[in-house]
Amino acid sequence: MFYPDQFDVIIIGGGHAGTEAAMAAARMGRQTLLLTHNIDTLGQMSCNPAIGGIGKGHLVKEIDALGGLMAMATDQAGIQFRILNASKGPAVRATRAQADRVLYRQAVRTALENQPNLMIFQQPVEDLIVENDRVVGAVTKMGLKFRAKAVVLTVGTFLDGKIHIGLENYSGGRAGDPPSISLSQRLRELPLRVNRLKTGTPPRIDARTIDFSQLAPQLGDTPIPVFSFLGNASQHPEQMACHITYTNEKTHEVIRNNLDRSPMYAGIIEGIGPRYCPSIEDKVMRFADRNSHQIFLEPEGLTSNEIYPNGISTSLPFDVQMQIVRSMKGLENARIVRPGYAIEYDFFDPRDLKPTLESKYIQGLFFAGQINGTTGYEEAAAQGLLAGLNAGRFANDEDGWSPRRDEAYLGVLVDDLSTLGTKEPYRMFTSRAEYRLMLREDNADLRLTEMGRKLGLVDDARWAHFSQKIEQIEKERQRLRDIWVHPHSENVAEINAVLKAPLSKEANGEELLRRPEIDYRLLTTLPSFGPALTDPQAADQVEIQVKYEGYIARQQEEIEKQLRNENTLLPADLDYRQVSGLSNEVIAKLNDHKPNSIGQASRISGITPAAISILLVWLKKQGLLRRSA
């Protein structure tokens, strides 16, 4: 039977991608349905109990700047917060938080259940309704049919998921959850390229059986950071310490002696695993010269005794897992409460997607998260927000939107996926972005919140907070520009006392702030330059904008040059065999990737500058040279 109501957008899956997609579509005013196999696992942290990190924290800030959920949920659930790379430049500083799994899940569910325009329904999805190459609905396991104008697939590792522990394996979406077999088979019938990937998780350890007295604690930062631009530390629950231990030669010997029982090394697992989050057996073999690896013992929550040993993801048999754990300092008597495992699952080639994450072949069908070949909560959530937003726009007959590479890490992420695809689980790093100085955590709201407001994602409270911050920054910078001191000014001795070289000519506040020995806090304690802004976000922004102004201006010039290529569009139906002068290799790659623009074409491996020049000349001769707005 058909459900009596029609929806604008259906989201299939309630993980990090699905929950952000559902919230985005509903915030835009679209009638949204979130279909999940289990309402109790909405927002579940399936692997490590942490949010953020290098590159990943940047994505979380961008999600927040666009009105998303992840940062606010982390502020309500975070039990340890740290700023990584704190001693380095602002471009690579990143926030990371340990999170209480239960509190995080509760925060996500509360937000979903209180979001207008959003209905949640518990049923696995087994089929899509596709008519004339356009998706128009979904069918659940009990045969109930839902109609919608757009559908977003955020099914994580559930598509034909297979769990491996040693040489044994069984079907599963993750530990304790069934796989999605019928939906996987249905999707394989569509004109989409599909392959297999693998990821894994470590065994969980009972904290009561760990001798923490032997281990070094790792504490959070003071003052405690926050994730959301609207957050404050008073929202955080009680804070906890992590602890550090190490593998050793005994650990490595156990692993080497049992490689024949590893499903990965025995050839049972076909999917490719994540390069930047390898299993412990992979680390031991790939880095044979290392006699130890650092392992972080991360608490799973305030009310849980489970410890997540970050760094020993494994699919070795349970008896070997016990030997590995008990070979490490402090864990000699440890008990495992959940075994580690690897999971193989289907993913679909993201080169078959537009930058909006809509399928090139099935209208109204959007993909987000691990189904696109990514790994990580943050990457999934960012894609979910974008897919939900664009599904909402599609349902309203509006053009899709996607940020450029110079506008957001989200732009880098979707451009990498839709242009280059991936053969291994893709994770975000700051090194993937060409314009890191522009894409900092601290300015994510300055880059994206205004656009989020135009798109209908940003509510009045966030907009008022953002507008006030912008006003504070502009007024404070003007105030500093208007305050001048010269070598003979009254109180100049106090200023010279903190300068490496005394004033030799007149200078204003911004010129003093550009000096490496002066920061904003110090400047505003000097005569005439106080008082300081009370909003730490606005104060940080003033300092960064002033100190890096020259570098930022140069990077902006580079961006403007690149945009000329980025905005030169390529016809979607162009057969590159028509373009004389291109090599057979270039023709094959362009016909395979079908890039949207000259800029996108230039990032495809093997596409040379000479090939780009030939393309530009051909487009001009054919009268096809046009640029997007």
UniProtKB/Swiss-Prot annotation:
Main localization of the protein described in the UniProt heading: cytoplasm
GO molecular function: flavin adenine dinucleotide binding
Chain coiled-coil ranges: none
GO biological process terms, semicolon-separated: tRNA methylation; tRNA wobble uridine modification
Binding-site positions, NAD(+): 273-287
One GO CC term, this protein: cytosol
Subcellular location: Cytoplasm
KW Transcription (keyword) present: no
SMART domains assigned to the protein according to its UniProt record, in alphabetical order: GIDA_assoc_3 (SM01228)
Subunit and partners: Homodimer. Heterotetramer of two MnmE and two MnmG subunits.
UniProt-listed NCBIfam families: mnmG_gidA (TIGR00136)
Function: NAD-binding protein involved in the addition of a carboxymethylaminomethyl (cmnm) group at the wobble position (U34) of certain tRNAs, forming tRNA-cmnm(5)s(2)U34.
Protein's UniProt name: tRNA uridine 5-carboxymethylaminomethyl modification enzyme MnmG
Primary gene name: mnmG
